[in-house]
């Protein structure tokens, strides 16, 4: 990873790249080396999901190539290998509350994956699909609590912060 002239968030980028490069798939054997390299360019700055987009594009491109080489539909290949509740991720963490299969099935239906693309009346030349996993530095569990106050009001406490991911209540 290009760290620029200063480390800033580069250690986080290197960690995220290593953790998420395997995608949301069941793998029995996996290894990643990830480095932040100092260069004479501006330092990398913060953004949501640093490194995740890079490794997702690379990994999901490989999934398509592998499925094609095996003569398999890329969606069916993903559905067969995607993580489900109780699976252990390559980091050793047992995964819970996963909905990748439902996500893929709903998306495939919603975008008309099995219909052909009208190339004569469109500037589209094809379509693709990708599935990602995002790491977090916080625990992977959260909690919500409602307190009934003495004045009759309720106070909602949640263990998340709204950073654009849709947790705003």
Segments the model singles out, each with a brief description of its role:
Residues 1-53, 121-169:
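Gly/Pro-rich active-site capping loops and adjacent beta-alpha segments
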Residues 43-111:
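N-terminal leader/propeptide and maturation segments of large enzyme subunits in energy/redox metabolism
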Residues 82-153:
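Helix-loop-helix junctions that connect adjacent transmembrane helices in secondary transporters/permeases
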